[in-house]
């Protein structure tokens, strides 16, 4: 289970942000993971890396920049769908997208190619964002593979997605999006420190948005435990183990801020990372 909220605007007001993104990664606490960092094999990419045997090198959220633009990829599981026999690992969907800057890996071409081959994976939502010149609107797409669907979303609008189809959101996603919109409206031109603190507070929200018919259908056994933005299901050692905020300001300065568990206890120590990168020379 994961959630993501974002607003992508290629031409924000001075002092505003081209990208405001907040995301929780929900996973088993024991799953081996590298915290957000510049990637060793692609030094223009930033994000966490999955170390699970057989899934090494994949990621759930990453941002990459190149000459003239930057792009973001995020992957969310679609809960409650049957798993294909011999399903291919999904983590490389994001990694392949953000590491390559050629035309074949443009947001349009990459998604159209993925759409033709997406049923070999377990069910997912793939969010892709591409932001370049201020004269061109940000491009935002969401690809779901059950059923195979590719949708476009608008520059400058706030969106929230989770582990259901985009037009059947869980209650926590619906309410979270409303709160995210309020934060963007109130703090969308605030300092990185102020805006990121507000977004982290949203991601830590433990309120259970229950009952939820869609979540009850997709996860009948875990539904109530999964109904908060900040998930913690102690008996299964599962929950929101990583909170991420990614900001790119109007001058193309990127901030990747992450809080992630260092052990198996969500009440224990968390590792805090703040990566700053000036995309100006590349964008």
UniProtKB/Swiss-Prot annotation:
Family that this chain belongs to: Belongs to the Tango2 family.
GO CC list: cytosol; Golgi apparatus; mitochondrion
Compartments, record wording: Cytoplasm; Mitochondrion; Golgi apparatus
Gene that this sequence comes from: Tango2
Sorted UniProt keywords: Cytoplasm, Golgi apparatus, Mitochondrion
Name of the protein: Transport and Golgi organization protein 2
Cited InterPro entries: TANGO2
Known role: May play a role in Golgi organization.
Pfam families: TANGO2
GO terms (BP aspect): Golgi organization; protein secretion
The keyword Mitochondrion belongs to this UniProt entry's keyword annotation: yes
